[in-house]
Amino acid sequence: MEDEAVLDRGASFLKHVCDEEEVEGHHTIYIGVHVPKSYRRRRRHKRKAGHKEKKEKERISENYSDKSDVENADESSSSILKPLISPAAERIRFILGEEDDSPAPPQLFTELDELLAVDGQEMEWKETARWIKFEEKVEQGGERWSKPHVATLSLHSLFELRTCMEKGSIMLDREASSLPQLVEMIADHQIETGLLKPDLKDKVTYTLLRKHRHQTKKSNLRSLADIGKTVSSASRMFSNPDNGSPAMTHRNLTSSSLNDISDKPEKDQLKNKFMKKLPRDAEASNVLVGEVDFLDTPFIAFVRLQQAVMLGALTEVPVPTRFLFILLGPKGKAKSYHEIGRAIATLMSDEVFHDIAYKAKDRHDLIAGIDEFLDEVIVLPPGEWDPAIRIEPPKSLPSSDKRKNMYSGGENVQMNGDTPHDGGHGGGGHGDCEELQRTGRFCGGLIKDIKRKAPFFASDFYDALNIQALSAILFIYLATVTNAITFGGLLGDATDNMQGVLESFLGTAVSGAIFCLFAGQPLTILSSTGPVLVFERLLFNFSKDHSFDYLEFRLWIGLWSAFMCLILVATDASFLVQYFTRFTEEGFSSLISFIFIYDAFKKMIKLADYYPINSDFRVGYNTHFSCACLPPDPVNLSVSNDTTLAPEDLPTVSSTDMYHNATFDWAYLSKKECVKFGGKLVGNNCDFVPDITLMSFILFLGTYTSSMAMKKFKTSRYFPTTARKLISDFAIILSILIFCVIDALVGVDTPKLIVPSEFKPTSPHRGWFVPPFGGNPWWVCLAAAIPALLVTILIFMDQQITAVIVNRKEHKLKKGAGYHLDLFWVAILMVVCSFMALPWYVAATVISIAHIDSLKMETETSAPGEQPKFLGVREQRVTGTLVFILTGLSVFMAPILKFIPMPVLYGVFLYMGVASLNGVQFMDRLKLLLMPLKHQPDFIYLRHVPLRRVHLFTSLQVLCLALLWILKSTVAAIIFPVMILALVAVRKGMDYLFSQHDLSFLDDVIPEKDKKKKEDEKKKKKKKGSLDSDNDDSDCPYSEKVPSIKIPMDITEQQPFLSDNKPLDRERSSTFLERHTSC
């Protein structure tokens, strides 16, 4: 909707007359609510219909007359059934649409207190229910709160509440400092307006100032002195004629009531743990309902204070009160009063009405808020649902932004995580991203990245001052160390130890620390990748075959590749990232996740091959299984027992000593030592090592299962919230520690983490600096540009796709991205690593996602029954920097790290692979292939896209993923980045296979399509002129229809509860239904 008011076209422009058949043919009638005069004053200056407006009217009339009679009939009927804008919506549009610099209204805590007799005698206000988001009731006999549940209201109570707002006292922005002063003000206002008899003021005041008993309070034992002083009930005192004058009665009773009233919160309030569920700036809304015997007509008041005031023990928790709703009525209708109290309390917990209550100017604004609530309310048939059944709060609440934006003229709601829904078409995935806009200037994007990130540089350090950062450091450190060791070992095998584990550690530490300190997105974790390893292997073999110096050749390739990356930075080539839609991103990230999962199981299977299980072992036949080490020559080498060496002496014994200078008992040798010194292993059990494989799999699967379970422990029902959050944050670290202890207690010799203990190059044939000349012919320096082009594509694709995944809008990053700055530092670090003969590093997808997951922030306070809301990610540079510094220091922590079993770290790899697949739409669609239709979840794209089209899209994605996997597993893996680039071309071809409507829900729309669509919208807006935006989506021409709300017919036939207990008098009991009937 537009923010501007709808132009008054005049009643004669197009008038709809209600037909008798239309009225009689429906079971509901349509009631028009007159727009208050204040609505007219809100409008801007009147404009006479000029030439342009007349032209519009003629054009609309022509369009309308061109349609067939059937279409006109359909439009006529639809205009009756569904008006464009209801009067409530019009008014709320002005209330919520006003530009106001004041902060958003605070969270409300709503409490329902009812006037009840305690022990059958004394009347007190007893808390019976409370709301923040959901309703909690005080159980009848359990003296406990119920579980939070969705409040189910009767439709009749909502209409009675609406009548209460029409008939009762509405007091807005009043000032009061205490509850007695507030009650006095309400009673005086009722008397002034003729709603309360003056002689009833004392009784009403006494009743409203009775003691409030909350669920947190236990029954207090009254002393003997108090028993004689307290009054048995309010009705007994007021029915006694000897009590003296009304003034004296008021003084006495008020003073006795004030004994329990204080402006300061009580100790029980301050100790209430429920305060943890409320934000610091929360305010209270108190609802007081009850029945008394001295009133003939209901006493109704709705009060909004100018400033929230602490009213003592009025509220369960020590928060100031802003709203007060009072309903006292005659005896016999306690249930009706209770339901009305629940209705106003539920309305105050509704986000839209909550805002209206704060901004309302008069009674009509509040009534419009109720009408808007009625427009959105859903009615359940009485015979198909039991109201006593409590509806569990949903896991994800529907956002109220759609309702608010509709009235405030906000942006369209978003779907698919980041794609705005515009009539079925989404906006391009990254096309509207400021960081990816091409500047057209030399290094324009890089300069903008630096200017964007510079103001946040200081906050990137102090934002890490949280216990969550410690958990992230330990988790990512262990993942990085494991990855560095694994990659270093493979790289050593591929390059004949020209680059090994130590180079991997040093390169990871230097590159990662510098990148996290100065890059545009410090949440990205640098690591070595599979395609880089394949390139290193091919390059080493090529250099070996052609007698080239491998490290010098690699140096020039790195320099050329870094130069090309800098050219890409200078020309803003990162704008091409906007063509990486969800299809490309999910294909790449899913592939990397599957690689992590595959490698974890592959390493465990390799471990099982190295430590095989003896499947032929039979219990009770232990004597059949043996293994002995025999000397290579059957000569007696161990005759003398005097010189027999113990196992601890082995390190000092050489092979020559064993054969010539000392006698030796070969039975003390281990399997490895026996083979090393040339002995022979004899026996049928020599190939088997008991328990190691089994124990390794227990550690592997136990670490994974424990990590997953403890990560989800935050939503568990056990332990307090703080403990659950702490366990969830440290889930991976706790899992590693638990299974390290189990491994140590069991004592099985499982393979452990091996870290280099000396700081020196792995190969003795190289140093820490590679000279650029002298090892190869001069033309090799120029020829290196050809393979460097392939490396540049590899670096650019790996880096930018990971950066796009990290910077997705669903992560709610607030400090912006830095695509150009990131690539700049990757190029600089590539130069450094090339000169030092260290591996090249690029953004690692899975570890980066794990880093983000470990730093996700949620609301500290959430209403009972409400899931914590995701606030964003803790954006800072400290965690990544410390992770890589610790990685560099790992050489000196070898004595500690050697106790960590490798199967435990493989379990962490498995966890990272599986966890990074959570929330990926591709995985959700993959599960749909195996699900019957009736069991499929209610995904938004399933509502708008045919299932066969969804399956076709998923099948194409699976096919592309399978081709990438096959390519990765062959020698052609070096062109893997090129094939990732081919995914963009495949996605482009899908525009001819799928409609833009389908792609807007299943994927992101490619920027050109989005750009054209936006240009078309601009043209439409220019043509439409000042017509209301709702008419753009409607088939009906503009008309000034009478808006209406639908009311069931049986409501008009019921006696309003506000009337006296007399026979039905239609003239006296006329409600807003009869006063505002439009037809």
UniProtKB/Swiss-Prot annotation:
MF term (GO), any: sodium:bicarbonate symporter activity
Cytoplasmic side: 1-466, 521, 572-585, 711-725, 808-819, 856-877, 919-960, 987-1079
UniProt feature, compositional bias: Polar residues: 251-260
Modified residues (Phosphothreonine): T249, T254
Residue ranges, annotated region (CA2-binding): 1002-1004, 1030-1033
GO cellular component: basolateral plasma membrane; cell surface; membrane; plasma membrane
Intramembrane segments: 961-986
Location of the region described as Required for interaction with AHCYL1 in the Swiss-Prot/TrEMBL record: 1-62
Modified residues (Phosphotyrosine): Y30
Subcellular location: Basolateral cell membrane; Cell membrane
Extracellular side: 492-501, 543-550, 610-692, 746-779, 837, 895-901
Catalytic activity: 2 hydrogencarbonate(out) + Na(+)(out) = 2 hydrogencarbonate(in) + Na(+)(in); 3 hydrogencarbonate(out) + Na(+)(out) = 3 hydrogencarbonate(in) + Na(+)(in)
Activation/inhibition comment: Inhibited by 4,4'-diisothiocyanatostilbene-2,2'-disulfonic acid (DIDS).
PANTHER family: ANION EXCHANGE PROTEIN, ELECTROGENIC SODIUM BICARBONATE COTRANSPORTER 1
Family: Belongs to the anion exchanger (TC 2.A.31) family.
Name the record gives this protein: Electrogenic sodium bicarbonate cotransporter 1
